[in-house]
């Protein structure tokens, strides 16, 4: 059954002591690096969702700093479940660096230095997020939007 409406989700690019957290999830094909995140629940703001999802998936308490990027994925072949997603991607600050993965959602993590993260093997949506972060980190604080990339019509 095809869903009738897009699925709003959040992603967290988590920073702590000038290092950025990336994770691997079995939900993403090709086992590339991505960011923790998930669905926004009914009655929950995007900021509340990112705090909850970061805690559930990584064990980290985070503070949302900025909404960096909004992007859409329509039936992407990179994700295990082809749907229409709206990604609200936040930069978040971790209160500590003691990661405890939810192994049902994630199977690996790594703290990357800011300089090396742009060379990491990431899926395409995280690549867009890292570009938005680089702009933000260089002083350009505008919100970016990446239009639909559809695999099917």
What are these regions (language model features)?
Residues 6, 31, 82-86:
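Residue-level preference for beta-strand/loop junctions
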Residues 10, 62-65:
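Small-residue-enriched segments and motifs
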Residues 30-33, 104-153:
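Nudix hydrolase/Nudix homology domain
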Residues 40-63, 74-125:
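Unchanged
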Residues 16-56:
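Conserved Nudix-box catalytic region and its N-terminal flanking loop in Nudix hydrolases
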Residues 1-20, 88-91:
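Conserved N-terminal beta-strand and adjoining loop/helix that marks the start
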Residues 5, 13, 26, 99-102:
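Generic structural signal for beta-strand residues in well-ordered domains
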Residues 67-70:
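Residue-level recognition of beta-strand microenvironments
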